[in-house]
């Protein structure tokens, strides 16, 4: 009888430990402020760019061939400049990230190195927010930390944080996942792409720059010399030097802005909490 009680106690303890378990993934520095992450596919380690503004998770054609996946079809995305990106697809691929296995029904297949300078270290793919569509994650990018939460740890993580005004967007084909943060200005809401991969300045469209009174003639190639502007993010006032550019969004948050806060993203409930 005592043995049974001990076994039941051990099983209960294991379940409690598991319920509080988090998977903390360490991000690695790349060029400028960009981050990479180790992704294992069929036991082999690859170097993926972690990009919250990446829209689609992609693998290189080389990986698809190594794991004998058929490359097929066509998918279309847009860079913030409006440039069209054409890619293909592959199905049924599992990633191991930290201790977490994530199954992808479909991923994009495209060679990211085709748009990067030749001297950049090789990138094998892009890990976008789409990979976490069934999860709750916490991003503390200033400390190079990505946490995959469970239901219990997520409640603890959200505690003390404020809810952000956001939109979750799935792109023109319904196959992407991006987050836009609503930033108020003169009784209107402007929507900024949540883009950790933007290692440059916070960007304003030409139209938004007029609202924030950022004159093109005051800009220099060295944006650090540009004037500061104020952006209200949730209950926080962010003062940062933006740059006006011909882009397809109202604006694009950058690494510098995102690194000032800690974000917990609940994809199922489409909520973003931050502090």
What function would you assign to each model-found segment?
Residues 1-24:
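Bacterial Sec-dependent N-terminal signal peptides
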Residues 20-275:
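Pepsin/retropepsin-fold aspartyl endopeptidases
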């Amino acid at each position: 009888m005592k043995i049974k009680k001990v076994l039941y106690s051990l099983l209960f303890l294991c379940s409690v430990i598991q319920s509080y378990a988090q998977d903390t993934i360490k991000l690695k520095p790349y060029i400028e402020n960009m981050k990479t992450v180790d992704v294992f596919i069929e036991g082999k380690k690859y170097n993926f760019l972690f990009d919250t503004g990446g829209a689609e998770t992609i693998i290189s054609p080389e990986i698809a061939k190594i794991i004998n996946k058929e490359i097929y079809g066509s998918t279309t995305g847009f860079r913030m400049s409006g440039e069209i990106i054409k890619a293909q697809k592959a199905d049924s691929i599992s990633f191991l990230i930290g201790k977490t296995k994530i199954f992808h029904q479909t991923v994009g297949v495209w060679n990211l190195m085709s748009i990067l300078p030749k001297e950049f270290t090789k990138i094998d793919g892009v890990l976008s927010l789409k990979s976490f569509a069934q999860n709750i994650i916490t991003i503390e990018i200033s400390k190079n930390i990505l946490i995959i939460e469970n239901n219990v740890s997520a409640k603890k993580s959200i505690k003390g944080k404020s809810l952000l005004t956001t939109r979750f967007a799935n792109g023109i084909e319904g196959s992407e996942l991006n987050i836009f943060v609503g930033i108020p200005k003169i009784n209107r809401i402007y929507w900024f792409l949540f883009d950790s991969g933007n290692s440059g300045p916070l960007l304003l469209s030409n139209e938004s720059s007029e609202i924030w009174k950022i004159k093109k003639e005051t800009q220099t190639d060295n944006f650090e010399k540009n004037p500061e502007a104020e952006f209200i993010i949730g209950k926080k006032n962010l003062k940062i030097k933006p740059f006006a550019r011909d882009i397809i969004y109202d604006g694009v948050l950058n690494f510098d802005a995102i690194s000032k806060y800690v974000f917990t993203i609940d994809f199922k409930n489409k909520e973003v909490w931050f502090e």
